Amino acid sequence: MNKYEMFFKVQNDYQPSPYVQVVKRLDPGMYKVTYDDMTDSVTFKVMESNHDELVDLPETEYDAVVSDVDLFLRPETEAKFKEMGFIHKFNILLHGPPGTGKTCLVNRVAQKLIAANAIVLFNPQPYALQKTYEILDAIQPDTRILVIFEEMDEHVRREETALLHVLDGEVQKKNAMYIATSNYIEKIPARVRRPGRFSSVI
């Protein structure tokens, strides 16, 4: 059995592949999510972070993102969101030409959140997140989530409606942070990257 694959059974009459392990809870870490609409099931495949890609980054950019992460992790922040009637979540958009350190920065943030017992979902299809969130809410509702959308412009091109439902529509998740990256921010319509949708655009 592949130890890097885990499967949550969501239908009693469906038997998972013998190569997939059934688990009751996800450990902190980074996962690739696959949704099977025929069986209405979600598979989480463990990914390993690439520490070799961590390089020096402009301190102002790194500090700005880490400041948002630290704010997100504070219990008083969650309490304040709840008091105001808002869902506790943060959305960050990182942009710039290839080679400017976006991936390295995302890796650092992912490691910081994993160390705080979070689950990281790497580049999921937006339409698959509704079922993913239903499962996570059922088994570990208070776990913090980091969702990474690489090449945000491509997600917008293929699944804009589903993406917007996730970011601030019908498919929202409490205790979730979203980090989207793009090499070509001009390809993302202004309505998608408006300030009210992203707390930080860096």
Per-range role (PLM):
Residues 90, 145-146, 177:
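The start of beta-strands in P-loop NTPase/AAA+ ATPase cores
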Residues 76-84, 165-177, 188-191:
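Conserved Walker
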Residues 108, 143-172, 187-189:
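Conserved AAA+/SF3 P-loop NTPase catalytic/coupling segment centered on the Walker-B
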Residues 114-143, 160-161:
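Short glycine-rich substrate-engagement loop in P-loop NTPases that contacts/grips substrate
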Residues 149-150, 176-183:
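Structural recognition of the conserved hydrophobic beta-strand(s) that form the central parallel beta-sheet
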Residues 190-202:
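A short helix-turn-beta junction within AAA+ P-loop NTPase domains corresponding to the substrate/partner-engaging
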